[in-house]
Amino acid sequence: MALVLQLLPLLLSKVQGNPEVSLEGNPGDRVNLSCIGVSDPTRWAWAPSFPACKGLSKGRRPILWASSSGTPTVLQHFSGRLRSLDTGIKRLELLLSAGDSGTFFCKGRQENESRTVIQVLGDKAGCRPSGSTHGSEYSKVLIPLLGFGLVLGLGALGLVWWRRSCVPPSHIAPVINAEPQRPLEQDSKISGHLDQEPNLHYADLDHSVLRRHRRMSALVPGDASTVYAVVV
C-alpha cells in the first residue's frame, strides 16, 4: 500500500501532463522520457547531477536534435543508449548507466520545455570514472613510494659523505730521494783509500818523538844497551 502511494504522484503526473517527472532506476534499466506539454519538440538537453562521475562540467548540454531526415542526432555520450520511440523525438528510451543522474529537458520551438529528473541508484557526489579511479589509486601508492625511495637515496649519499669526511687520510709513504749511484771509478777510489789506511798510520807518526830518540842515542855511549822505543 505504501509503495502504491509513493508511485501515485508519478502516475498522476503522467496522466495530467505535469511538466516535471521524477524517475529512479539502476544501471542497466531502461526508462522512458516524454515531452509533456510540448507540442513540437526540437531538441533534448541534459544537466548532470554529478558531472564528476562522467568527467564533465556543470550545466546543460544538448544530447539529441531533431533531424529533417527523420533520424535524430544523438550526442556521443549517449550514443547506443538513447533512441526515439516514435517518428519525432517526443518519446525516448534511455538505457541507464552510472552517472546518468540529472535533469533531462525537452525543448520546443516556442522555447517551452518539460523536465524529467532521473536518479540512478548508486550515483553520489564523490563518484569518479572507473579509469580515473584506478589512476588515482595508482598515484596514491606510487607517489609515496617514490618519495620514500628519494629519501633513502639522499640519506645513503649523506652517510657516505659523512664517513669520508670523518676518516683521516691514509698514511702516505715518505718520499725517499734515492741517492744517485756512484760510478765504478769512485768505488775503486774509495777501495784504494781503504787499502792505504795502514800506511797513513805511519805517515801520521809524531816526528818529534823520533827526533828525541835520536838525541838520546847520541848521548848514550856505544857500549850502553840499546833501548828501542816502539811508538804505536
Curated annotation (Swiss-Prot):
Keyword Signal tagged: yes
Please report the PTM annotation for this entry.
N-glycosylated.
One matching Pfam family: G6B
Q: Which residues lie on this side of the membrane: Extracellular?
A: 18-140
Where are the Phosphotyrosine residues found in this chain?
202
Q: Which GO terms describe its biological process?
A: blood coagulation; erythrocyte differentiation; integrin-mediated signaling pathway; megakaryocyte development; megakaryocyte differentiation; negative regulation of signal transduction; platelet formation
UniProt keyword Ubl conjugation present: no
Residue ranges, Cytoplasmic compartment? Answer: 162-232
For this record, an example GO cellular component is:
plasma membrane
Residues of this chain annotated as glycosylated in UniProt = 32, 112
Locate the transmembrane regions by residue number. 141-161
Motif (ITIM motif) on chain: 200-205, 226-231
Signal peptide location in the record? Answer: 1-17
UniProt keyword annotations, A-Z = Cell membrane, Glycoprotein, Heparin-binding, Membrane, Phosphoprotein, Receptor, Signal, Transmembrane, Transmembrane helix
Where is it located? Cell membrane
From which domain of life does this come?
Eukaryota
The way this protein sits in the membrane is described as: Single-pass type I membrane protein
- Which InterPro entries does this chain map to? G6B (IPR028070), G6B_V-set (IPR048308)
GO function term, MF aspect, one: heparin binding
Q: What does it do? A: Inhibitory receptor that acts as a critical regulator of hematopoietic lineage differentiation, megakaryocyte function and platelet production. Inhibits platelet aggregation and activation by agonists such as ADP and collagen-related peptide. This regulation of megakaryocate function as well as platelet production ann activation is done through the inhibition (via the 2 ITIM motifs) of the receptors CLEC1B and GP6:FcRgamma signaling. Appears to operate in a calcium-independent manner.
- Recorded domain comment: Contains both a transmembrane region and 2 copies of a cytoplasmic motif that is referred to as the immunoreceptor tyrosine-based inhibitor motif (ITIM). This motif is involved in modulation of cellular responses. The phosphorylated ITIM motif can bind the SH2 domain of several SH2-containing phosphatases. The 2 ITIM motifs of isoform B are required for the inhibition of CLEC1B and GP6:FCER1G signaling and platelet activation.
Please describe the quaternary structure of this protein: Interacts (via ITIM motif) with PTPN6 and PTPN11. Binds to heparin.
What protein does this entry describe? Answer: Megakaryocyte and platelet inhibitory receptor G6b
